[in-house]
Amino acid sequence: TPTGPTGAARAGRAGGMRALALGRGALPPGQPCVEAVSGLFATALTRGGLTGGHRVTLVMPEDAPAMRQESLLRLGAQIIHTPAQAGLAGARALAKATAAEKGWYYMDWLNNDDNPTYHRRETGPALVRSTAREGSSIVDSIVIGVGSGGTITGVGETVKAWTKGARIGSAKP
């Protein structure tokens, strides 16, 4: 799986989604980004965004783990809190509203087609190449953890295109 500077697959996805947005002009150079996220994707987005010249603001519930928040702040992220009871839905709503109000780019990784597009272009082909024997992939089935659905969509479509009859399974982490 393609990875980014943190070594995690989500780092590759964050960088890939940013590159796709830049490429189509949705994310102009220097435009700040906002996203509702606090995990590995947040770390990858912060690192990649800042090295690429995009200030990153993360919106998360106030009860997100303190160590994670401290780490993200040290990396250079700005954090906006929502009430804990608002959960991810509240954080996403505030991120979207903040982007609209300030003219920032809202990555919206859970609903953005750049997520599966990245996996169609990078992760899926990397998997097929790594399993290729005599010109064809030997993958007959694959199980993929499902969060946003981007990985299973992009990788699943790629594997099925290269390996007729391949079965794609999901696992909820």
Protein language model features and the residues they cover:
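PLP-dependent amino-acid enzyme catalytic core
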Residues: 1-173
